[in-house]
């Protein structure tokens, strides 16, 4: 049974959709008079937090251009797990038409994809600005629309649930040591995985016709009335 190639890019699309949520967050700095002095878009990259911490430790000279390294955000996938609470019928098939033929695929399988979003900053106020722009949208979930299977036009709203928030201050050493405050937000994306899509042997219904007769003898009786209908989608093809 295994070995039939197919690739809907569902996990990849889910990762991209998650990152898109946080790719336009800004922080602003003000002087003592309350005048805005800077507006910075926070960089976002896919990768583990340890990668960025190692770079800060190995290249302390980057402190001369703080905006290049901090603040910044990173995210990564932490786990993929089956979600039995959203389980549907196993033997049912999902059917869709592209206008010329009918396609079918078995009902999707629910999976949860875990994400970790790390916010690395030098100043705690920067972290608070970023976190406050994120939290109000998650109550505790935020829906994103993902085109799961292009060939059948299957789009679904994927809830992304905020699970928990943690904080740590990775500052150890003397005053010359680079400080990094880290806020970690854990999320769960409730997505669906589809199997291979195949052509349905049932064919596409292009026209429906119903005849009414005045007698049960349909061969000899005169037809009294005929109704016919063409699906709206076929009229516009």
Where are the predicted features?
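Acidic-leaning, charged glycine-interspersed low-complexity segments
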Residues: 107-109, 129, 138-197, 204, ...
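Oligomerization/assembly interface segments of phage tail-like spikes and tubes
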Residues: 71-79, 107-123, 132-134, 179-192
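Small/polar-rich, solvent-exposed N-terminal microdomains that initiate assembly or binding
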Residues: 1-92
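Membrane-lipid interaction segments
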Residues: 41-50, 57, 83, 94-107, ...
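Conserved small/polar residues in nucleotide/adenosyl-binding loops
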Residues: 235-237
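Extracellular/virion structural assembly segments
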Residues: 2-9, 13, 80-81, 102-112, ...
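Amphipathic alpha-helical scaffolding segments
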Residues: 91-94, 132-141, 204-208
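Short conserved micro-motifs at the rims of enzyme active sites and ligand-binding pockets
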Residues: 84-88, 195-201
């Amino acid at each position: 049974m295994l070995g039939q190639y197919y690739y809907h890019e569902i996990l990849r699309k889910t990762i991209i959709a998650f990152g898109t949520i946080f790719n336009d967050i800004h922080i602003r700095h003000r002087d003592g008079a309350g005048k805005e002095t800077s507006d910075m878009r926070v960089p976002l990259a896919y990768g583990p937090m340890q990668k960025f911490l190692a770079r800060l430790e190995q290249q302390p000279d980057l402190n001369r251009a703080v905006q290049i390294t901090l603040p910044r955000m990173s995210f990564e996938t932490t786990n993929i797990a089956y979600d039995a609470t959203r389980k549907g019928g196993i033997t049912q098939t999902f059917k869709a038409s592209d206008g010329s033929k009918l396609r079918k695929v078995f009902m999707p399988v629910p999976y949860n994809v875990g994400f970790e979003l790390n916010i690395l900053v030098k100043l705690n106020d920067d972290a608070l600005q970023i976190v406050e722009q994120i939290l109000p949208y998650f109550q505790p979930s935020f829906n994103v629309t993902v085109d799961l299977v292009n060939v059948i036009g299957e789009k679904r709203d994927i809830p992304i649930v905020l699970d928990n928030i943690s904080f740590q201050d990775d500052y150890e050493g003397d005053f010359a040591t680079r400080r990094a405050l880290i806020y970690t937000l854990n999320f769960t994306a409730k997505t669906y995985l589809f199997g291979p899509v195949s052509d349905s042997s049932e064919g596409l219904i292009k026209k429906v016709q119903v005849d009414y007769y005045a007698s049960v003898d349909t061969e000899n009786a005169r037809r009294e009335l005929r109704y016919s209908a063409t699906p709206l989608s076929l009229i516009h093809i």
